[in-house]
């Protein structure tokens, strides 16, 4: 053994060839933490000191190569002064440079996934051989930063600036055939032939058949583009990427600027440019929020995994109520491998559900994400039925009938008599109390809520609602089924609206107050979209459905009359009474036409102003900042109340619920991180400025206490 550490070993293979293997003890994946970087330095030193070494193969002892840097270390690192961050990056890059500058040929054998620093390690090698099942990429822009271990320097010099910009700015994982096509890897082999392929390459380099020094040289030099080519490549890319990323996500454009600035430099000077830009991005609030989001997501996965121990495996599912929602649930279950019965009392609803599932599967086939054979397999896994004949072997039933408590109670009581005693019943409800629905059941311990968001196939969140009598096994089994469906489940306790809708309706309440104060809803939409929401509140209400919003608001007002009940008519009342229901009937706040692709397209409709006129009670002068505060303060304060009331267990889950469930701007991190970014004391003072708008704007006593003590939601 030439070197042995806790993350890296170097051992002799044959004929002077050594294997530098990453295998971080106590972890399921390899990552570049402080320990691994330090050991890489020692391992490279050991190789340099051993005159018998003729070639090096870099490999992994795990199913994946290296997933990148240890993101948990970013939180403290990024608090350092900018100059220290630059120095730290340059120090790390000296290790990669030392590996790249070894006097012997080097080959990276890429298995599983090599992301971020993992791919940057491979780029420092002379040759790369990749398993057919492996994926590689530089996803750092998703964290608000860009590659900092030489990725912006080596990749464009290997595969050309256009390809490198596409890889870095998109942050996507790339398959083996695509990597080979652009020259990011030198060979692609079957997984079982990976080591043999790496050995073949290194032996050919040692023998002189391959000139590894010539292969290495372009990575050490400036980019091979003249001034005109540079201008065309970089200016065009910056314009396009800025349009794609938007103003709230600076990292993709900054990555292009860095490649451009470093284009005329050799490796070492180019790495200095990279380090300086990386440090600037690392200090932004966007990076802080997106890294926080990543860590929150890991916390969500950890909590969901904790349920596995007692969860029953749902081998056979059923959905009650077909149609669009039932069809979407059936599709999601079947395509992820759990066969499902789809029951309705009407043949036309069954057909609608099957059509929905078939359409979604067909779309995946068209996009190359599913083979026709897999589509047929998924369709066969959906069994339509008008009766309960096959329900005896069902492990979990998702009830997705109309949002009416009496109807749901009747259907749930009926299906309970048709399933085995330990089958789980889950109601897909957005607002109705799980405790109320449970009263109709003989086995309420087997009952939970399972709130899917529309459209089911696109929305990543599922709220699993624990009722007073729900057993931990019922909760765990439902969480496990949601995970099998490819969803991100969050367990919440029962209350009107659960987490997401309870928080969303105060936001809509702020919107209603603005419209009643004479503020143009189109202006409100523009301001909130600029703030970072995927769509403004008026457009969102049209998409959700004015009738759905009207019903939801009434449920919330009944549940929280002290702050959510408004005695005055609102914009939603006016539109509902005028039968302007949004996209579903072609007119709401906006009117809707069908575009060339058959999708609804919003257009202005002056007639809505007459409908809204009776509910405009005053004409207030408000700034864009006021609009944001009228909307965001109620949403944030209701999130705080949900955490304080124990509806959601952690701040991480609360924030991820809003990002996944209603499209809260990811670069702002979630409602509680947004409060942190303002400062808890500053947020309380801000809310107090709007206290005259009503109880939705009044901070809780506990939040005032946090403000007084200088506390945060995230440390």
Curated annotation (Swiss-Prot):
Is Cell cycle one of the keywords?
no
Q: Catalysed reaction per UniProt?
A: a (3S)-3-hydroxyacyl-CoA + NAD(+) = a 3-oxoacyl-CoA + NADH + H(+); a (3S)-3-hydroxyacyl-CoA = a (2E)-enoyl-CoA + H2O; a 4-saturated-(3S)-3-hydroxyacyl-CoA = a (3E)-enoyl-CoA + H2O; (3S)-3-hydroxybutanoyl-CoA = (3R)-3-hydroxybutanoyl-CoA
A single GO cellular-component term from the record reads: fatty acid beta-oxidation multienzyme complex
The answer to whether keyword Lipid metabolism applies is: yes
Give one Pfam hit by family name.
3HCDH_N
Give positions of region: Enoyl-CoA hydratase/isomerase: 1-190
Top-level division of the source organism's lineage:
Bacteria
Write out the residues that bind NAD(+). Answer: 325, 344, 401-403, 408, 430, 454
Q: Fetch the InterPro entries from UniProt.
A: 3-OHacyl-CoA_DH_CS, 3-OHacyl-CoA_DH_NAD-bd, 3HC_DH_C, 6-PGluconate_DH-like_C_sf, ClpP/crotonase-like_dom_sf, Enoyl-CoA_hyd/isom_CS, Enoyl-CoA_hydra/iso, FA_oxidation_alpha_subunit
**Site annotation Important for catalytic activity: residues:** 120, 140
Assembly? Heterotetramer of two alpha chains (FadB) and two beta chains (FadA).
Per the record, the similarity remark reads: In the N-terminal section; belongs to the enoyl-CoA hydratase/isomerase family. In the C-terminal section; belongs to the 3-hydroxyacyl-CoA dehydrogenase family.
The protein, known as: Fatty acid oxidation complex subunit alpha
- What is the protein's species of origin? Ectopseudomonas oleovorans
């Amino acid at each position: 053994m030439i070197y042995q550490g806790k993350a890296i070993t170097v051992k002799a293979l044959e004929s002077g060839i050594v294997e530098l293997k990453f295998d971080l003890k106590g972890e399921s994946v390899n990552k570049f933490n402080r320990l691994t970087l330090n050991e890489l330095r020692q391992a490279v030193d050991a190789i340099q000191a051993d005159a018998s070494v003729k070639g090096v193969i870099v490999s992994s002892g795990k199913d994946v190569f290296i997933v990148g840097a240890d993101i948990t270390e970013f939180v403290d690192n990024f608090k350092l002064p900018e100059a220290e961050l630059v120095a730290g990056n340059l120090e790390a890059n000296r290790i990669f440079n030392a590996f790249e500058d070894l006097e012997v040929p080097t080959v990276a054998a890429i298995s599983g996934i090599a992301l971020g620093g993992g791919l940057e390690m491979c780029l420092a090698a002379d040759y790369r051989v990749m398993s057919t099942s492996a994926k590689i990429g530089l996803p750092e822009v998703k964290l608000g930063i860009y590659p900092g271990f030489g990725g912006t320097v080596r990749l464009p010099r290997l595969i050309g600036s256009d390809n490198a910009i596409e890889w870095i700015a998109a942050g996507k994982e790339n398959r083996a055939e695509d990597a080979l096509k652009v020259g990011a890897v030198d060979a692609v082999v079957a997984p079982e032939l990976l080591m043999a392929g790496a050995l073949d390459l290194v032996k050919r380099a040692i023998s002189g058949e391959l000139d590894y020094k010539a292969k290495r040289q372009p990575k050490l030099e400036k980019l091979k583009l003249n001034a005109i080519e540079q201008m065309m490549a970089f200016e065009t890319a910056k314009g396009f990427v800025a349009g794609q990323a938007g103003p709230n996500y600076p990292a993709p454009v900054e990555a292009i600027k860095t490649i451009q600035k470093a284009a005329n430099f050799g490796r070492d000077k180019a790495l200095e440019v990279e380090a300086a830009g990386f440090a600037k991005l690392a200090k932004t609030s966007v990076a802080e929020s997106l890294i926080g989001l990543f860590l929150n997501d890991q916390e969500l996965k950890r909590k969901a995994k904790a349920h596995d121990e007692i969860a029953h495996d749902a081998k056979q599912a059923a959905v009650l109520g077909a149609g669009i929602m039932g069809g979407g649930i059936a599709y999601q279950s079947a395509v992820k491998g759990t066969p499902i019965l789809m029951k309705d009392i009407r043949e036309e609803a069954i057909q609608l559900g099957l059509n929905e599932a078939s359409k979604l599967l067909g779309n995946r086939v068209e996009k190359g994400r599913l083979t026709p054979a897999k589509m047929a397999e998924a369709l066969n896994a959906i069994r339509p039925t008008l009766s309960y004949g096959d329900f005896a072997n069902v492990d979990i039933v998702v009830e997705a009938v109309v949002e009416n408590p009496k109807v749901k109670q009747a259907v749930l009581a009926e299906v309970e008599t048709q399933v085995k005693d330990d089958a789980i019943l889950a109601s897909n409800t957005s607002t109705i109390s799980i405790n109320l629905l449970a009263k109709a059941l003989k086995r309420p311990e087997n009952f939970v809520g399972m709130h899917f968001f529309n459209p089911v196939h696109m929305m990543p969140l599922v709220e699993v609602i624990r009722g007073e009598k729900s057993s931990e096994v019922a909760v765990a089994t439902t969480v496990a089924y949601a995970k099998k469906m490819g969803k991100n489940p969050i367990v919440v306790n029962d209350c009107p609206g659960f987490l997401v809708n309870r928080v969303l309706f105060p936001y809509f309440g702020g919107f209603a107050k603005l419209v009643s104060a004479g503020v143009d809803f189109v202006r409100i939409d523009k301001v909130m979209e600029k703030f970072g929401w995927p769509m403004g509140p008026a457009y969102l209400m049209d998409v959700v459905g004015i009738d759905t919003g009207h019903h939801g608001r009434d449920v919330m007002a009944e549940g929280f009359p002290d702050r959510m009940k408004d005695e005055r008519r609102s914009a939603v009342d006016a539109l509902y009474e005028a039968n302007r229901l949004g996209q579903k009937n072609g007119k709401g706040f906006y009117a809707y036409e069908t575009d060339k692709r058959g999708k609804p397209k919003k257009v202005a409709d002056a007639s809505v102003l007459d409908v809204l006129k009776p509910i405009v009670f005053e004409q207030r002068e408000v700034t864009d900042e006021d609009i944001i505060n009228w909307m965001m303060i109620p949403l944030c304060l209701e999130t705080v109340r949900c955490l304080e009331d124990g509806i959601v267990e952690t701040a991480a889950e609360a924030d991820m619920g809003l990002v996944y469930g209603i499209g809260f701007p990811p670069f702002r991190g979630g409602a509680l991180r947004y409060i942190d970014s303002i400062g808890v004391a500053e947020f309380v003072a801000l809310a107090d400025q709007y206290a005259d708008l009503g109880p939705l704007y009044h901070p809780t006593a506990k939040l005032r206490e946090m403000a007084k003590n200088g506390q945060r939601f995230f440390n």
